[in-house]
Amino acid sequence: MADQLTEEQIAEFKEAFSLFDKDGDGTITTKELGTVMRSLGQNPTEAELADMINEVDADGNGTIDFPEFLTMMARKMKDTDSEEEILEAFKVFDKDGNGFISAAELRHIMTNLGEKLTDEEVDEMIREADIDGDGQINYEEFVKMMMSK
């Protein structure tokens, strides 16, 4: 399944993997997974974290290595995000709940994920997704952006 990914996708997933793999040892532990999820405003229990790891932990060693992570991402891409998942993601970005993602909200989330973006990069992301040109991303624009990935 992971062999259906483009080089660009694999590079993107490698970057995402490094954000999770805080100590850089090549594996994601439940602790590291929890840290990232909490930085995104989620509050998973230890049991939920263990379940998430076990779901993709092919060799059963209790951690996720990069090949296992790729398989998980490929699987997720295949059952392309349900409307519900996209709405949840939108709510994570839309901190003040006003129905729009502002440049400041986008910058805040990306920084929490460990992605240090310049103001230009954040503005560029907004511009790419901002179909009606109002300087922020509404839900419809967010859905289009998520579906086009």
From Swiss-Prot:
Top-level division of the source organism's lineage: Eukaryota
EF-hand domain boundaries: 8-43, 44-79, 81-116, 117-149
Family according to the record: Belongs to the calmodulin family.
Residues with the N6,N6,N6-trimethyllysine modification: 116
RNA-binding found in the keyword field: no
Binding of Ca(2+) 4, residues: 130, 132, 134, 136, 141
Extra remark: This protein has four functional calcium-binding sites.
Annotated positions binding Ca(2+) 1: 21, 23, 25, 27, 32
Species of the source: Saccharina japonica
Modified residues (N-acetylalanine): 2
Job description of the protein: Calmodulin mediates the control of a large number of enzymes, ion channels and other proteins by Ca(2+). Among the enzymes to be stimulated by the calmodulin-Ca(2+) complex are a number of protein kinases and phosphatases.
Protein residues bound to Ca(2+) 3: 94, 96, 98, 105
A Pfam family annotated for this UniProt entry: EF-hand_7
Protein's UniProt name: Calmodulin
